[in-house]
Amino acid sequence: MDKRKKSLSRQTAGIRGWIQAAATLLTNIHIPNFFKGKIYQGNAKTVCVPGLNCYSCPAATGACPIGAFQAVIGSSRFKFSYYVTGFFILLGVTLGRFICGFLCPFGWFQDLLHKIPGKKFSTARLKPLRYLKYMILIVFVILLPLLVTNSIGMGDPFFCKYICPQGVLEGAIPLSLDNAAIRSALGKLFSWKCFILITVVVLSILFYRPFCKWICPLGAIYSLFNKVSLLNIKVEDSKCIGCGQCSKVCKMDVDVCKHPDHPECIRCGACIKACPKDAIHYRFMGK
C-alpha cells in the first residue's frame, strides 16, 4: 500500500462528517416541502436510498429500503422482491456497514447528539444487546408483516409503524406542524413513537449510536456482509506494534487488530486516524 492511498484513507476518515452531511442532503433534497406540508411523490420515490430515511419525510428523495421491504412482504399479491433483496445484496457486498458510518442520515443524527457535552458511557459491557437488532429484523420486519394480515391478506409494516424513530422525526412531526388534518388524527401510536424517539435521543447523548448497535434492522442486514464486502479495513500486521490505540478509540466496541471485518464495524475510520504507524487503511477489492 503506497503512501498516497494511506493518505487518502486518513483524508476520507477526516472528512466523514462532511460526507454524512452531504449524504443526508442528497437523501432529503426536496427541502421546500417541509414548508408545504406535503411529501415528494416523483419517480425517484420508486428507488431505495442506502440509509434509514423515512419515505414520509417531506424532503425525502427516495424510499427507505426497510419500508419497501416490509411493503412487499405485507402485500396481498407479492411476498418477495428481487429488487429490494438485490439492493441489499449489491450494497452489502460493495460497501457493508460503511453505509452506516458515512451515508445514513439517522446515523449522522446520533453522531451529532453524542457530541453534546456531558458525561458519556461505554457500551462495552452491553455487547449482548447487539443481537437485539437481528431479532427485530426477523420478527418485526419479516415475520409479523408476513404472517399477521387483515381480511384481504395485507400486513402492516410493523417496524415502521411501531418502532422506527426516524419515521416520527422526519415524517409525522414535520407533516403535522403544517397540516391540521394530520394533527387531529394523532393519537396513542404517535405518543408511543415520540416516547421511542425521545428515548433514542437521550441514549444517543449518553452512549454512542445505541440505535445502530441495538435496534436498527438495516444495520443488521448490512452487517451480514461486512466480512465479504469489497470495501473493508485492512490492518498490516508487519507494521502493527500492538499498542491497542485502534481498539481504544473504536466506539463500536470492536477489537480492530483481531477483527477488522467485524459485523459491528461501521468503517468510520477512527482507528485509521488513531494508528501511530499508519498500519490501518481502507481497502477496496483487495487493493
Task: List where the protein language model places each region.
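Non-ligating segments of multi-cofactor redox enzymes
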Residues: 1-257, 263-287
